[in-house]
Structures are given as structure tokens and as C-alpha cells.
């Protein structure tokens, strides 16, 4: 639940439960920013809220179950609940499970959800529109101050067989490049040290607008991933250094190659999140994904030649309909050669409305589980081998949390290297840090040990 309080008498308070991906989190921030402009405060718990918003996820059946459970908990604890987000597109299913909900709105229907809050918990004060920026430039953050998600577009033009994002979020709709850069500049000025660029398809940014250029700092800048990355890398965090800039959800188009030199130059964090999903040409074709796994291996080698520090994260689906043991072994062999830095895997789940549901030869659940265990075992071993090579090196680390002194007075801290995005990747655990260290500080750390996913070390002596 968000915590933003106010001393204004009788001010109505809103609670927020945000589920799902970082893109949904950005939507939650935007909704809360608008509500604060309209005179609301935010409640840190159910008891203090006049109404509770539940921003749902509807991508997988398991996510829908989690969303319905969260709605039920909010109803039990508070009783006045408004539902929004991706599962909001299934209003009948929500009302069948929880008829007490006050209102249901769909994904990124900002005006509708704000209107529902006004209807069921009218603000006791007038709007404070002069106190904060426009809603498109999120003022309320649900992440720590030192990192922020920067959403550059909504929707997707692909028709992957396992996905219903286009039905939930629509076709690609890119934000104006100048609006994105203004938001990024504002976030950095407010203390953000790390920008995480997100969308449904970051590589396609600007395709729908034919990469329309806008004026920025006296020059024309195109709405294109490469141009955006270059501009973000020129922002100043206040000490003469740029923020860390990570690219997430990058579809492997050929023009992705152009951002690798920016990483080598230090303008962009050497990190790419590319959801390859599989390696077997047969499975990729069934998924309606690009099937050129050999070319991907060549590109990985080329990227590493240009920027040896690059970390590549990806996600894969196991147990897709028609996936044979040979297909799965092909994937494992491909992963052995690709040696990706960070890997997430998911067991295939049928999603209502997805084309994959009609495919023949479903994989039994016990086979999915066995394959999931095998892919996680392999990728954990590869990760451990790669992290072992970092022992003895000094790496830049951004601090996420500083602990309390132990009985000996030693203070520990947790941070992340440039190879680690928040919440989904590994961590760096530091020992005996100075009491002056704070979240958001970027320090050089000497790596002393490593396991399958995390590093351990101490601040390097200058």
C-alpha cells in the first residue's frame, strides 16, 4: 500500500494494491498522481482508506487468481474496492467472484478509474492542480527514490500465439519523445540514479508515429530507441555522471545492434533484457516468434566483442504445445552456447483468448515441471560460472538498502551491479560499510565471493 500522508482536515484517503509487471506499476503511479492533484491523500493500510484501488494483472490464469485473491482481501479488510488494470477487461468474471466491488475499469483507463474514485469517495477539498506536474509526468513513486521505471509506449503490434497483450492493451502507441525526455529529466532531478526503460516492445518505439521527431534542447530528436537511449545517457544526476539506463522488453530487431556501442561508450548501462522465449525453430514458429536462433548466437558474440561487460537477460517458455524432448534439448544446447547472464523461465499456461490454446499436442504438467527444473538447473550453473569470474574485480554497485549495525557494530548493505535489474536479477551483499552510506549511492565494490545468483564483497579501498 502506498504511503503519502497529509495534514489537511477530513482529506479523503485512497489505498492502492498494485499487481503485475512494472508497466502496471507505472500506471498505478499515474493514477495516484492524478488523485493527489484532485485533493486525495494516500493511505498506508486498508483501515485508513476511504476506498481501495486494486490494479490487477490478467496475463496468465495464475495472475488472474492472484488478482481475484487480492480483490477479496481488500474487500474483507476495507469493503470499498475499485478494480482497474488488465483483468478489469473481464468485469463479469470479477463481479461474479466479488459482487461487492464498487466499480471495474480496464487497463490504462485513467479517467474512468479517477471518475470512479470521485463517485464513491468524493474529495473533501478542491483539486490542487497547481501543486504538481501534469499526470503524464508521474509525481508519486511506488519505487525507491533512486530508481524509476520510464514507460515509453503502450500496447504491442505482435501476435505471439501465447500472448493476449494486444487484446488487453491495444496496438502500439508511442509517447512523444519530448514528453519521455521531460519525464526522465524530472525524475533524475528528483534523485533517480537509475532509469529502467519499459514498454511492451521497447525496440518498436516510434514505429507507429514513423519515428516522429520533436524539438529537445534546441535540436530535433526522433522517437526511436537508439536516439532515446543516446539522449538519456546525456542526462546529469548532479555530479557530472549520467544515470544508469537499462533497456527492458527489447524485441531482437536488427537495429538493436546500434545501442551496443552506446554501452561501450558509457552512455547506456551494459544490460539488455530480450525475451527470446525459445530456441527451437519449430517451437518459435508455433509461437509466431522470429526463428533465427543461429543468427542470435552470432549477434551475441558481436555484442560481447564491442562491449565485453554486457549482461543479457532473457525469458523462456517451457512446455509450449507441441514441444518435444528434442525441441527442449535443442533449447538447452542453445543456452549452453549462448551463456546468457540472467534467465527466467515459465511453464506454459493456457490464456483465455490466446491462439496457442487451439494448438495440438499439449505437454503434460509433469513434463512441464521436469523441463522447468532442468532449464533452471542449467542456467543456474551458467550463472554461477560467470559470477565466479568476477571474484577479485572491482565493480560499480548501486546501493538499495543499508542495514542496522550488528552486535559488533558492523553495518551491511545490499546493492546491485550493472548486470542486475531490481527485483528480477541478483544482488550484491556488502559487509562493513560506512554509516554514511545511503540508498542510491554508487560505489566501487571488490567482489570477494559469489554463488549461483549473487555477489558478496566490500567497498573498494581508494
UniProtKB/Swiss-Prot annotation:
GO terms for biological process: tRNA modification. InterPro entries: Elp3/MiaA/NifB-like_rSAM, Methylthiotransferase, Methylthiotransferase_CS, Methylthiotransferase_N, Methylthiotransferase_N_sf, NA-bd_OB-fold, Ribosomal_uS12_MeSTrfase_RimO, rSAM. The keyword Nucleotidyltransferase does not apply. It catalyses: L-aspartate(89)-[ribosomal protein uS12]-hydrogen + (sulfur carrier)-SH + AH2 + 2 S-adenosyl-L-methionine = 3-methylsulfanyl-L-aspartate(89)-[ribosomal protein uS12]-hydrogen + (sulfur carrier)-H + 5'-deoxyadenosine + L-methionine + A + S-adenosyl-L-homocysteine + 2 H(+). Residues 12-122 form the MTTase N-terminal domain. Belongs to the methylthiotransferase family. RimO subfamily. Its EC number is 2.8.4.4. [4Fe-4S] cluster 1 binds at residues 21, 57, 86. The keyword Transferase applies. The lineage of its organism: Bacteria, Pseudomonadati, Pseudomonadota, Alphaproteobacteria, Sphingomonadales. Its cofactor is [4Fe-4S] cluster. It comes from Erythrobacter litoralis (strain HTCC2594). It is an enzyme of class 2 (transferase). GO terms for molecular function: 4 iron, 4 sulfur cluster binding; aspartic acid methylthiotransferase activity; metal ion binding; protein methylthiotransferase activity. GO terms for cellular component: cytosol. Keywords: 4Fe-4S, Cytoplasm, Iron, Iron-sulfur, Metal-binding, S-adenosyl-L-methionine, Transferase. Catalyzes the methylthiolation of an aspartic acid residue of ribosomal protein uS12. Pfam families: Radical_SAM (PF04055), TRAM_2 (PF18693), UPF0004 (PF00919). Residues 142-385 form the Radical SAM core domain. It is found in: Cytoplasm. PROSITE patterns: MTTASE_N, MTTASE_RADICAL, RADICAL_SAM, TRAM. This is Ribosomal protein uS12 methylthiotransferase RimO. Residues 388-461 form the TRAM domain.
Amino acid at each position: 500500500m502506498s504511503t503519502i500522508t497529509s495534514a489537511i482536515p477530513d482529506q479523503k484517503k485512497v489505498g492502492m494494491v498494485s499487481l503485475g509487471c512494472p508497466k502496471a506499476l507505472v500506471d498505478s503511479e499515474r493514477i495516484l498522481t492524478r488523485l493527489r492533484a484532485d485533493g486525495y491523500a494516500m493511505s498506508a493500510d486498508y483501515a485508513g482508506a476511504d476506498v481501495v484501488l486494486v490494479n490487477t494483472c490478467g496475463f496468465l490464469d495464475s495472475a488472474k487468481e492472484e488478482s481475484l485473491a487480492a480483490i477479496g482481501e481488500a474487500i474483507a479488510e476495507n469493503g470499498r474496492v475499485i478494480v482497474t488494470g488488465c483483468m478489469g477487461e473481464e468485469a463479469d468474471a470479477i463481479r461474479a467472484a466479488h459482487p461487492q466491488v464498487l466499480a471495474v475499469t480496464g487497463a490504462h483507463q485513467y479517467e474512468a478509474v479517477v471518475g470512479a474514485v470521485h463517485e464513491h469517495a468524493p474529495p473533501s477539498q478542491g483539486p490542487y492542480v497547481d501543486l504538481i506536474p501534469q499526470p503524464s509526468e508521474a509525481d508519486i513513486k511506488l519505487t525507491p527514490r533512486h530508481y524509476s521505471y520510464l514507460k515509453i509506449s503502450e500496447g504491442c503490434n505482435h501476435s505471439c500465439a501465447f500472448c493476449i497483450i494486444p487484446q488487453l492493451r491495444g496496438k502500439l502507441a508511442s509517447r512523444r519523445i519530448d514528453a519521455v525526455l521531460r519525464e526522465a529529466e524530472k525524475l533524475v532531478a528528483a534523485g533517480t540514479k537509475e532509469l529502467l526503460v519499459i514498454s511492451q516492445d521497447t525496440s518498436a518505439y516510434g514505429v507507429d508515429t514513423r519515428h516522429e521527431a520533436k524539438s529537445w534542447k534546441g535540436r530535433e530528436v526522433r522517437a526511436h530507441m537508439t536516439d532515446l537511449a543516446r539522449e538519456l545517457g546525456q542526462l546529469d544526476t548532479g555530479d557530472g555522471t549520467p544515470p544508469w539506463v537499462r533497456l527492458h522488453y527489447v524485441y531482437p530487431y536488427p537495429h538493436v545492434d546500434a545501442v551496443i556501442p552506446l554501452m561501450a561508450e558509457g552512455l547506456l548501462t551494459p544490460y539488455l533484457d530480450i525475451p527470446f522465449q525459445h530456441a527451437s525453430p519449430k517451437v518459435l514458429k508455433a509461437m509466431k516468434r522470429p526463428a533465427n536462433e543461429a543468427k542470435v548466437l552470432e549477434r551475441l558474440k558481436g555484442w560481447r566483442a564491442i562491449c565485453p561487460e554486457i549482461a543479457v537477460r532473457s525469458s523462456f517458455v517451457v512446455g509450449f504445445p507441441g514441444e518435444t524432448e528434442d525441441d527442449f534439448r535443442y533449447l538447452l544446447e542453445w543456452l549452453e552456447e549462448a551463456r546468457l547472464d540472467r534467465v527466467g523461465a515459465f511453464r506454459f499456461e493456457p490464456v483465455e483468448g490466446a491462439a496457442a490454446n487451439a494448438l495440438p499436442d499439449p505437454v503434460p504438467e509433469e513434463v512441464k515441471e521436469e523441463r522447468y527444473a532442468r532449464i533452471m538447473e542449467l542456467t543456474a550453473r551458467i550463472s554461477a560460472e560467470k559470477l565466479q569470474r568476477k571474484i577479485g574485480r572491482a565493480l560499480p554497485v548501486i546501493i538499495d538498502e543499508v542495514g542496522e549495525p550488528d552486535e559488533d557494530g558492523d553495518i551491511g548493505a545490499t546493492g546491485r551491479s550493472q548486470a542486475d535489474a531490481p527485483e528480477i536479477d541478483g544482488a550484491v551483499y556488502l559487509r562493513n560499510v560506512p554509516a554514511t552510506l545511503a540508498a542510491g549511492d554508487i560505489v566501487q565494490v571488490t567482489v570477494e565471493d559469489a554463488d549461483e545468483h549473487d555477489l558478496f564483497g566490500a567497498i573498494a579501498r581508494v
